[in-house]
Amino acid sequence: MFGISFSELLLVGLVALLVLGPERLPGAARTAGLWVGRLKRSFNAIKQEVEREIGADEIRRQLHNEHILSLEQEARKIFTPVQQEPTPVEHVGEQTIHSPAAPTPAAPAVAPTESAPVVAPASVEHVAQTAAPTTPAPNDTTQPPRAP
């Protein structure tokens, strides 16, 4: 541990035996052992406390970094628009079923003397409310495929 070999320890023990004598040597060895144990325990306690402090500092640092990251994300949300401005919807002309390459037949001209029948608005609303919703044909290729 300290770079002391067995021969050096034997030399220290022999000097202690000569200085203290055989009567007081066992008590002195016990006291020295207690002191060494206390030193080891105190060093270990200091080491654990330092490691806990380092760990606590690391945890504090991580929490601080996470707090800063969350603040940055909130700032980005505030500064960037949540939704883009909606694009205006363009009115699409009348839906046609026939192919556009086919020639369109000429519509017969209506004589100005004939009057078209007038339908009351209430009857149109009534028909629109009672009409059944249309469903596409099972082999309709204009609709996206549905999941089974």
UniProtKB/Swiss-Prot annotation:
GO CC term (a single one): TAT protein transport complex
Compartmental location: Cell inner membrane
Keyword terms of this UniProt record: Cell inner membrane, Cell membrane, Membrane, Protein transport, Translocation, Transmembrane, Transmembrane helix, Transport
Major place of residence: membrane
InterPro entries, alphabetized: TatA/B/E, TatB
Low complexity bias: start-end ranges: 107-148
Record text on subunit structure and interactions: The Tat system comprises two distinct complexes: a TatABC complex, containing multiple copies of TatA, TatB and TatC subunits, and a separate TatA complex, containing only TatA subunits. Substrates initially bind to the TatABC complex, which probably triggers association of the separate TatA complex to form the active translocon.
Stored Gene3D superfamilies: 1.20.5.3310
Topology in the lipid bilayer: Single-pass membrane protein
Protein's name according to its UniProt entry: Sec-independent protein translocase protein TatB
GO biological process, one term: protein transport by the Tat complex
Domain of life from the UniProt record: Bacteria
Protein family: Belongs to the TatB family.
An annotated Gene Ontology molecular function: protein transmembrane transporter activity
Keyword Zinc carried by entry: no
Organism for this UniProt entry: Pseudomonas fluorescens (strain Pf0-1)
Described function: Part of the twin-arginine translocation (Tat) system that transports large folded proteins containing a characteristic twin-arginine motif in their signal peptide across membranes. Together with TatC, TatB is part of a receptor directly interacting with Tat signal peptides. TatB may form an oligomeric binding site that transiently accommodates folded Tat precursor proteins before their translocation.
